[in-house]
Amino acid sequence: MKTTTMSQLRQWKQEKRKFATLTAYDASFAQLFAEQGIQVLLVGDSLGMTLQGFDSTLPVTVADMAYHTRAVRRGAPHCLLLADMPFMSYATPELAFTHAAELMRAGANMVKLEGGSWLCDTIRMLAERAVPVCGHLGLTPQSVNIFGGYKVQGREEVAANQLLQDAIALEQAGAQLLVLECVPVELAQRVTEELTIPVIGIGAGNVTDGQILVMHDALGITGGHTPKFSKNFLAHSAGDIRAAIKLYIEEVEGGIYPAEEHTFQ
């Protein structure tokens, strides 16, 4: 099996070929997802909520992320692997480089940072030092205390224009990929069309180049509140996890998921 690369993702964008991605936190699920056809995985700091039981991602440490990144890499050696940089691990460019190096040594192909144009100096520094970067705009869970909860972002014109400008700035600084979370579908389309780098959506409609879900949401095993944008693919697959992942891939690639019911206006 060939290793998935960023060059492939850029080619898929040019070809308008949509792709499905998932979070993974251990070797077993990573291997299972890869065997069903998932080619891009994210070791998300969402593990703070899904695995550790916290009510936010803020308590997650770089050591936590490195541990799970190593596990996922062993399970899916050929996937393009992203790893979240947790809260306050990239407060300065120097700190970001130190922690990004740790995650890269653990097996990540790329690190993901949450934030707008204030991150440009950090992204530029990382890119110059051969650390590939994925940006993250819209609802950025590490900023939950500022947002006052997990709310849709970019609904007002001023906020939408700012998000678009931030996306452009991140790309110009050297970001190779962008995650766009919980924004109106019209804004997601503007961002996706404006950028030359691939855009992965979560709660951003079916107009982005790729889609990502937290694995627990895709399998319907999330406790408590279920996000509007999620779909329980396991429930549509007679309880067969492998069939559920294949269905998720098929619906993303076919533009079926996310449907209007999963989309914010």
UniProtKB/Swiss-Prot annotation:
Cofactors named for this entry: Mg(2+)
One GO molecular-function entry: magnesium ion binding
Gene3D superfamilies registered for this protein in UniProt: Phosphoenolpyruvate-binding domains
Keyword GTP-binding belongs to the record: no
Entry superkingdom: Bacteria
One CC-aspect GO term: cytoplasm
Cofactor mode of binding and number, as noted: Binds 1 Mg(2+) ion per subunit.
Subcellular location: Cytoplasm
UniProt-listed Enzyme Commission number(s): 2.1.2.11
Pfam families: Pantoate_transf
Subunit note: Homodecamer; pentamer of dimers.
HAMAP family documented for this protein: PanB (MF_00156)
Protein name (record): 3-methyl-2-oxobutanoate hydroxymethyltransferase
Species whose genome carries this gene: Yersinia pestis
Gene: panB
